[in-house]
A protein has these predicted regions:
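Oxidizing extracytosolic/periplasmic lumen-facing domains
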Residues: 1-103
Length: 103
């Protein structure tokens, strides 16, 4: 380890940086779960979802985090979800949470 390495900031994971930026600056819209992938135990681990921005429909896939996996019944096909997307690049999006009846 060189002397200058001590002063360098560790590089942030690009996926973590993207998610943090969308959580800070992204616009919110509603989307719909189209498909849900399950593991051997039947827990939903990944979803395919769609959303529409300015009459253009986008589709994306997201691996659910542990908090989202604990509420797998909220991510069944046809369920409504909240999406955060980049207004300059609407195809860049993340799932914020599932929308329940009580909002």
């Amino acid at each position: 380890m060189s002397f200058l390495d001590r002063f360098r900031r560790p590089k942030e994971d690009p996926e973590v940086a993207r998610r943090n930026r969308l959580l800070r600056e992204g616009r919110i819209t509603e989307g719909c779960v189209m498909e849900a992938t399950q593991d051997i135990q039947g827990n939903v681990t990944q979803i395919l979802y769609s959303y529409e921005i300015n009459s253009v429909e986008y589709e994306s896939v997201e691996i659910l985090n542990n908090d989202q996996r604990s509420r797998t019944s909220a991510y069944v096909p046809g369920a409504t979800i909240l999406i955060r997307y980049d207004p300059r690049q609407p195809g860049n999006s993340i799932v914020v949470k599932a929308v329940t009846g009580d909002r």
